[in-house]
């Protein structure tokens, strides 16, 4: 039977001082499944009984090994009283005819972890398989197969010992599009296996490095209806879909890594007919203004200030987050590549970032790249994309919600104490603000330094990034490609001891300064990543833990549905933010009680009277959609697009509470015409009257 000792039983054992064999007594909090216990099962094949040496209990089971697929399997399945972390150890009798690669697999709450043990040495004692999280009951197990080196594998006892949980951390690598990783099924299989062997729990896969398909690593690494597919993918293969399936089977998250603004290295962008037809969406350096698309830092790049560019990028985010079971979206190069950029390729385009700046600021002419107000506006442009993407990711129809919204953050030079002195600030990447506002769930600071040359830079950035995390996760991006194994291990250990929320290594395929060395993965699992761990939870996205929620929406001209740029949004009378070029706003960290909190949100914009919604429900960890139509706004036009149609009816159906059963769900206040905190037949009659308007 499975042996679980209570405190009372332990006391009796101490008094009796029983020792049936020469092995130590079972300790409190331990569960041991021997090969004669009910929790042990022969799943397949022939297993003989042996008693040579000093087994745990009376005997053990053994099977002849085989090459290729396993022909014999056994399982130890404990009954655990509580969910939690457990040290898992195996007992076996060693011998010269034993396999030196006995294939154990631990099936735990977050997936399955293969471990290979040398049974020729170290037996007649407990040998660790690692520390794993198990759910209470009988859902966990340890399995042994016989596909190993000659001649036999030994199945004796497995011990599960409850321990304190290691700190949850994000352990990922960047898998870039320029090397092996996910171009075909075998590459994905190998990548996932290496992630498991290294005790990684997430993969950041570069599914969009360029928006054209001119050469390898350019194009989409998923079946996209928006971006042309990359040319170096095996025929008929969907890299992202297959990667998600294989990684999830191993308990590993997959995050879609996207570069938003980098389109191509030549004009026009091959295969991308949408971007070919919109050269006005591109940004150039100040000296190239108005001359059509020109390279910036050798690359053709989109204009971060263009509303149409934002919509194009959000369509990509929605496709990934809604159509694929990704676990997150990860941005890279979410910044300007140089300060002397952000100017329009075509001056006739009235929605360029520069034209928006002129309209909003009242400035005339073309500002210098060093102009402080113009620089602040370019920071605003990039921030507008990040905060909008935060909503698209958080509200995606995805079974893995809550998804993680993350970004790679630059950390060039030594770490200053003021964020405005950072290289990120100079490239208009205001990432401390993004973390402070909660637009990111985690920032991944690209702390890429050779530890033999710049040890203080690395450590200073680790320490400073923790201070700038506010109440979100900060993760250290570490560079094996610049270091030998020993220095990488030293850097990772420093960051973990400092208290970061995780490590991301760059990159999957380049694991040392000497190049590609796959032995990195068993090395790191034997050192800094010694045990498998779970990813950190996001308490701000858990309604049982969070104390705040988010309001978002669009502000439009109610008569036409056209977006209103730079409208001011107020919460309970206080200014809380402005709309972007698409009329989109996001207000985070709004206090909410256990049952939600009603608050007033209002909007003011030049040329319109103020519009007030007095009873907007904010829910803990919730995302309340609150759209505004300025001027002539039809009752029932939920999405404020200038009409009352089937889209609005779908919303009304979900908000209909009946009399006295309010308040309506978050966002439903817009249908409560008589402001009696419900949506009933009175409100429905008004909706009917305007439907089709």
Which role does the model predict for each range below?
Residues 166-185, 256, 261-323:
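Active-site-adjacent "subsite" loops/lids of carbohydrate-active enzymes
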Residues 549-557, 628, 638:
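A short, amphipathic beta-strand motif
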Residues 431-432, 436-455, 465, 472-541:
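Substrate-binding cleft of secreted/luminal carbohydrate-active enzymes
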């Amino acid at each position: 039977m499975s042996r679980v000792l209570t405190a009372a039983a332990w006391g009796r054992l101490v008094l009796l001082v029983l020792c049936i064999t020469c092995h130590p007594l079972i300790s409190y909090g331990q569960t041991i499944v021997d090969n004669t216990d009910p929790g042990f099962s022969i799943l397949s094949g022939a297993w003989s009984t042996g008693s040579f040496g000093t087994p745990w209990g009376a005997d053990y089971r053994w099977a002849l090994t085989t090459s290729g697929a396993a022909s014999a399997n056994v399982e130890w399945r404990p009954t655990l009283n509580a969910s939690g972390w457990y040290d898992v150890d195996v007992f076996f009798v060693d011998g010269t005819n034993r396999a030196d690669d006995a294939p154990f697999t631990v099936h735990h709450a977050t997936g399955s972890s293969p471990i290979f043990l040398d049974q020729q040495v170290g037996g007649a004692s407990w040998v660790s398989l690692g520390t794993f999280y198990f759910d209470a009951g009988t859902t966990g197990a340890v399995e042994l197969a016989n596909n190993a080196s000659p001649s036999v594998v030994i199945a004796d006892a497995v011990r599960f010992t409850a321990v304190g949980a290691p700190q949850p951390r994000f352990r990922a690598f960047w898998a870039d599009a320029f090397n092996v990783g996910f171009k075909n099924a075998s590459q994905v299989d190998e990548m996932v296996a290496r992630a498991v062997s290294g005790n990684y729990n997430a993969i950041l896969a570069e599914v969009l490095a360029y928006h054209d398909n001119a050469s390898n690593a350019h194009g989409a690494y998923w079946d996209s209806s928006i971006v042309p597919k990359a040319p170096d993918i095996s025929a008929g293969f969907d890299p992202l879909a297959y990667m998600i399936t294989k990684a999830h089977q191993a308990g590993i998250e997959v995050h879609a890594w996207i570069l938003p603004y980098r389109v191509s290295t030549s004009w026009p962008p091959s295969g991308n007919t949408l971007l070919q037809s919109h050269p006005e969406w591109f940004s150039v350096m100040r000296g190239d203004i108005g001359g059509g698309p020109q390279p910036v830092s050798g690359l053709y790049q989109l204009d971060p200030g263009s509303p149409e560019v934002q919509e194009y990028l959000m369509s990509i985010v929605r496709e990934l987050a809604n159509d694929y079971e990704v676990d997150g979206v990860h941005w890279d190069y979410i910044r300007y590549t140089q300060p002397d950029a952000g100017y329009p390729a075509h001056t006739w385009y009235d929605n360029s970032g520069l034209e928006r700046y002129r309209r909003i600021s009242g400035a005339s002419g073309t500002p210098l790249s060093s102009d402080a107000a113009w620089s602040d506006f370019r920071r605003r442009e990039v921030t507008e994309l990040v905060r909008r993407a935060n909503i698209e990711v958080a509200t995606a129809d995805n079974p893995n919600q809550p998804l993680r919204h993350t970004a790679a953050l630059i950390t060039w030079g030594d770490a200053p104490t003021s964020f405005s002195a950072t290289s990120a600030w100079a490239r208009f990447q205001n990432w401390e603000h993004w973390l402070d506002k909660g637009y990111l769930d985690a920032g991944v600071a690209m702390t890429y330094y050779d530890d033999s040359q710049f040890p203080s830079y690395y450590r200073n950035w680790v320490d400073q990034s923790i201070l700038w995390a506010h109440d979100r996760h900060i993760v250290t991006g570490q560079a094996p490609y610049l270091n030998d194994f020993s220095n990488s291990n030293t850097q990772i250990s420093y960051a973990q001891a400092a208290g970061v929320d995780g490590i991301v290594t760059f990159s999957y395929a380049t694991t040392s300064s000497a190049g590609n060395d796959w032995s990195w993965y068993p090395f790191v699992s034997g050192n800094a990543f010694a045990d498998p761990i779970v990813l950190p939870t996001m308490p701000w996205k858990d309604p049982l833990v969070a104390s705040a929620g988010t309001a978002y929406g669009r502000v439009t001209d109610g008569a036409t549905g056209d977006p209103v740029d730079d409208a001011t949004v107020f919460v309970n009378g206080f200014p809380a933010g402005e709309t972007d070029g698409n009329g989109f706003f996001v207000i985070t960290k709004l206090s909410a009680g256990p049952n939600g909190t009603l608050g007033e949100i209002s909007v003011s914009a030049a040329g319109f009277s103020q519009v007030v919604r007095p009873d907007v429900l904010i829910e803990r960890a919730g995302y309340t959609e609150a759209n505004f139509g300025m001027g002539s706004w039809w009752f029932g036009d939920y999405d404020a697009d200038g009409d009352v149609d089937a889209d609005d009816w779908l919303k009304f159906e979900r908000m209909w509470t009946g009399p006295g059963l309010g308040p309506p769900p978050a966002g439903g206040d817009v249908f409560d015409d008589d402001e009696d905190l419900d949506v009933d037949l009175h409100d429905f009659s008004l909706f009917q009257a305007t439907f089709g308007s």
